[in-house]
Amino acid sequence: MKTILKILGGLVGLVLVLAIALVTWLSLREYRPEAEEIVEIEGSGNSLLKAGDSLSLVTCNIGYGGLDAEHDFFMDGGSDVRVESRQIVERNMEGIRSMLQEAEGDIYFLQEVDIDSKRSYGFNESEYLQEGLKGAAAFADNFLCDYVPYPLPTIGRVHSGILTVNHYMAESAVRVALPTSFTWPVRVCQLKRCLLVERVPLEGSDKELVLINLHLDAYDDGTGREMQTRQLAELLNAEYEKGNYCIAGGDFNQTFSNIDPSLYPVQDRENFSPGLVEVSDFGEGWQLANDPSTPTCRLLNQPYDPKDAATQHYVLDGFLLSPNVKLEQVQTIDGGFRYTDHNPVKITVTLSE
């Protein structure tokens, strides 16, 4: 009996030592971005922009090519950690790229774009999308971890971020770090959220078009999203006070104050509970641009079945426009969640003279 207890004690001790070693290693290797970092712009846009011009923007969370209609996700109440093969990722990415090309945007804000992750079988999605969409491309890391040790099987290595592809001549791009509510040791393997801020000079003017690509917190208690939205509002208002034109867009992981909540009532708050973007928090004249006629996101608690009562839809994706940007049209492009758990949103706007 004593021998058995010694063996069990030794095994428990070994597990503890390995766990401590893993946490220590991950802590030493934790991605710790600066408050602001310059982002390299690859390629170049071929169009100039000036006040009075109209332009179109498309935002889409591509779900790293692994969240198609046939799959669920463990964080949303499902069981899948990744799809079964690289071929599925490639098929999804081909469908996503075609859908974005057909949207014919001048500027694309894309989220959950993998560079080299186990979950997407090492497929470089940023490079693939840049080849298909053309233009000036800026990529900002927001999930960089050598090994995410949960669930079983584990997520493993992740290198992912947000990508802006711009057909106009961008002057600069900066990664702006966002606050988080997560603390050590949970923080070590969590996303490091950010804003990807790109500046486009306006012909014949000292003003700029400020583009902000974003992907805010999802699986926190709501505190992180609130802090991140507050920082976004401060940045946008500071730029608008300079006379600049501002367009922020992406996956807010929140619903919007201009949408009737009864359109897509939240039935499942246990697996995901979205916050609320209140447009009045941004100041007078700011405008939310979204199209609630079609949902932009689904809960990944199960493979997609639009007729199932357990299917949960949301409107979490869209744009925020400064008072000097006029909204001409907004449309949620219905992709049927075939290749990703989000639908693209396209807007056409005019920069007021």
Regions found by a protein language model. Give the residues of each.
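A well-ordered secondary-structure block
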Residues: 33, 144-209, 213
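Active-site beta-strand/loop signature of hydrolases that rely on acidic residues for catalysis
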Residues: 56-62, 92-122, 165, 198, ...
